[in-house]
C-alpha cells in the first residue's frame, strides 16, 4: 500500500505532483505564506495577480519557494475577455501557463459565471494556457469546459469563503462519474474533516484558503489539512466499506456450545 501511495501522482495536463493539497494565498500575511506552504507540504499555490505587483517591495513572489508551482488565477475578471487579459499578464510576469480561471460577475454571492468561464477556457486553451476553470458544479458546463480544453475542473463545494463544507456533494459526485478529468474541489471547505470527506469521494485534489488563513494557528491548521487530504486519499485507494444495516463483526451464537 505504501508503494501505491508513493506512485500516486496528481496529473494536470503535462504536470505531475506528489501532493494533492493546493494552498490558496489570498488572505495570508506575506510572512506566514512560506511557513504555511512548508506545513501543508503543498506543491501548488494559487496566486492573485493583484498580489504580485512587481513594483511592490513586499512582493508575494519573494515569499514563495522557487520549487513551488504557481497557479495564478484571474480573480477580478467579470467576463471571458477580462480573464484572457489577466492570464496574458500572468504569463508576462513569468508565472507559467497553468491558470485558474475565475470569472465572477455576481458581487453578492460570488458565484462563478459558468457561461463566461466556458468562453474563457476556449480562449486560453487556444493561446497555449493550461486552464483550470473554477465553476458551479454543473455537468453540462463541465462537459463544455472539457471539450474546449480544460485540463481539470474545479467545482465549488460551497460559496467561496463560507466554510460550509460539501454543500454541492451530490453534484460533485456526478462530475466524478461523468468527467474524465481531474476534479479539484475548490471553495467552501472549512475543516480538515470536510477535506478528508471530499478526498474519500475520489476527487483528485482539494484547494483551501479561508479555513487556514482564519485559523488561530495558521501553520498548524495547514498541517492538519495536509494530513486530512492524505488520509482521505488513502481511504479512497484502499476501498471504503459499503454502508449497510447492522452486521456482526464477531460470531454471536455457537461459541458457548464448542
Curated annotation (Swiss-Prot):
Where in or outside the cell? Answer: Cytoplasm
| Gene Ontology molecular function terms on file | thiazole synthase activity
Which enzyme type, at the first EC level?
transferase
Give the enzyme's EC designation: 2.8.1.10
Q: Which keywords does the record carry? A: Cytoplasm, Schiff base, Thiamine biosynthesis, Transferase
Q: Describe, as the record does, how this protein assembles with itself and its partners.
A: Homotetramer. Forms heterodimers with either ThiH or ThiS.
| Record's function text | Catalyzes the rearrangement of 1-deoxy-D-xylulose 5-phosphate (DXP) to produce the thiazole phosphate moiety of thiamine. Sulfur is provided by the thiocarboxylate moiety of the carrier protein ThiS. In vitro, sulfur can be provided by H(2)S.
Protein family membership: Belongs to the ThiG family.
Specify the protein name. Answer: Thiazole synthase
Species this protein is from: Campylobacter jejuni subsp. doylei (strain ATCC BAA-1458 / RM4099 / 269.97)
Q: Which gene encodes it?
A: thiG
